[in-house]
């Protein structure tokens, strides 16, 4: 069995000055099974599964001020032009099934899953006086942070490191093995099904993120300081 699913969109918002706002997602899965004759005294099967999924989304955390939203809810500020979400996932598993009798069967699965993602998105603005302000505060009260608001909307910045774009980088994995014994029987016309399982599991997350700094020049962001 092989399956594939792809979908995407060009997006429905418009960035000041132009830019991508859509997404592309791809998901693939393959399964393969070998087994003994179904009529065999001890039936066994071995199933392999492999999967791969990716996503590229030109999505942002940056919203709009109340007034700008009322005027055009589909607008995106120029300060979000670099925002990008990228993800990748892979999974592997092998499952062994053995039917010992009408009442007993054992299912054992070995598995591994890996997932990584990086949401690269504007985080804060630093004005010409060196005052750093989060994007949330700017949008809540643009009148108090007029210079920061102007930079977000595309006005040229005198500060070369005006916009901080954070790489929210993560990677995860999970792996393990589990066995389940299924025991079923009937007593006095009552059917019983008992499962006894044992699992060894391990998972981990690795988080490494950094900030790249940009200047805004007439609606175009230019990298000035690369994060490490």
What would you call each of these model-derived segments?
Residues 1-8, 16-58, 87, 95, ...:
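Transmembrane beta-barrel wall of Gram-negative outer-membrane proteins
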Residues 2, 25-30, 71-75, 131-136, ...:
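Glycine-rich loops and low-complexity Gly/Arg-rich segments
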Residues 3-14, 67-77, 87, 151-163, ...:
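Flexible, solvent-exposed coil segments and beta strand-coil junctions
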Residues 9-11, 55, 115-117:
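A short local loop/turn or secondary-structure capping micro-motif enriched for an aromatic residue
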Residues 12-27, 33, 77-82, 91-95, ...:
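Extracellular loop and loop/strand-boundary signature of outer-membrane beta-barrel proteins
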Residues 12-20, 58-67, 119-125, 207-213:
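Outer-membrane beta-barrel translocator domains and adjoining extracellular loop/strand segments
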Residues 39-41, 46-47, 87-228:
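Face-selective signature of the C-terminal outer-membrane beta-barrel domain
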Residues 40, 47-72, 224-228:
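Surface-exposed loop/interface segments of Gram-negative outer-membrane beta-barrel transport/assembly proteins
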């Amino acid at each position: 069995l092989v399956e594939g699913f792809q979908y995407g969109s060009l997006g429905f918002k418009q960035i000041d000055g132009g830019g991508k706002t859509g997404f592309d997602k791809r998901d693939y899965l393959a399964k393969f099974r070998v087994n003994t004759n179904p009529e065999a005294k001890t039936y066994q099967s071995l199933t392999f599964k492999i999967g791969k999924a990716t996503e590229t989304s030109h999505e942002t955390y940056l919203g709009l001020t109340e007034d700008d939203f009322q005027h055009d809810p589909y607008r995106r500020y120029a300060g979000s032009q670099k925002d990008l979400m990228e993800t990748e996932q892979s999974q592997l598993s092998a499952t062994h099934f053995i039917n010992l009798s009408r009442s007993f069967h054992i299912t054992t699965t070995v598995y591994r899953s890996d997932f990584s993602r990086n949401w690269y998105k504007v985080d804060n603005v630093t004005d010409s006086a060196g005052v750093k302000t989060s994007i949330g505060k700017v949008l809540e009260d643009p009148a108090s942070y007029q210079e920061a608001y102007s930079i977000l909307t595309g006005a040229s910045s005198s500060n070369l490191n005006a916009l901080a774009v954070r790489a929210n980088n993560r990677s995860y994995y999970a792996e393990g093995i589990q066995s389940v014994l299924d025991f079923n029987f009937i007593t006095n016309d009552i059917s019983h099904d008992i499962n006894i399982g044992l699992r060894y599991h391990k998972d981990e997350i690795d988080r490494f993120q950094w900030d790249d700094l940009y200047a805004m020049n007439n609606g175009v962001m230019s990298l000035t300081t690369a994060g490490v």
